[in-house]
C-alpha cells in the first residue's frame, strides 16, 4: 500500500483510491497498463525512471512503440488530475523519462483498514 496526497495505491488489488473532502474514498478505474505505469513510478518515487526502464518493466519481452509510454503517462496524469506544465505528481525529464515527485508513504499494514 502506498499513500500520496489524497490517493491510496493498492498494488495487491490493483486499485487506486482518492479520498474526498468528506474522508470517503472513491475508486478510480485504471486500465491494467495504466495502473502498472503508475505503480512503477510510485514504487521508484524521487528518482528518474527512463523511458526504456518503463518499457522493460511494464511491457517485458514485448515490442512496443516508444510513444506508448507517453500515452500511458498522459492517462495516469489525467487520473491524478496532474498537469505536465505545473506537475505535483509526475515530472517530465525531457528526452530522458519521468520522476514521481510527490511524497509517498507506506503505512504499517496493521493500520490500514
Model feature map: region roles:
Residues 1-113:
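Cytosolic linker/terminal segments flanking nucleotidyl-cyclase catalytic modules
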Amino acid at each position: 500500500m502506498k499513500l500520496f496526497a489524497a490517493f491510496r495505491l493498492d498494488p495487491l488489488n490493483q486499485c487506486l483510491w482518492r479520498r474526498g473532502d468528506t474522508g470517503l474514498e472513491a475508486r478510480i478505474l485504471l486500465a491494467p497498463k495504466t495502473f502498472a505505469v503508475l505503480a512503477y513510478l510510485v514504487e521508484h518515487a524521487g528518482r528518474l525512471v527512463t523511458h526504456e526502464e518503463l518499457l522493460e518493466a511494464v511491457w517485458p519481452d514485448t515490442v512496443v512503440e516508444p510513444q506508448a509510454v507517453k500515452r500511458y503517462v498522459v492517462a495516469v496524469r489525467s487520473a491524478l488530475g496532474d498537469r505536465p506544465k505545473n506537475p505535483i505528481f509526475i515530472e517530465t525529464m525531457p528526452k530522458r523519462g519521468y520522476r514521481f515527485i510527490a511524497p509517498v508513504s507506506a503505512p504499517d499494514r496493521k493500520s490500514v483498514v
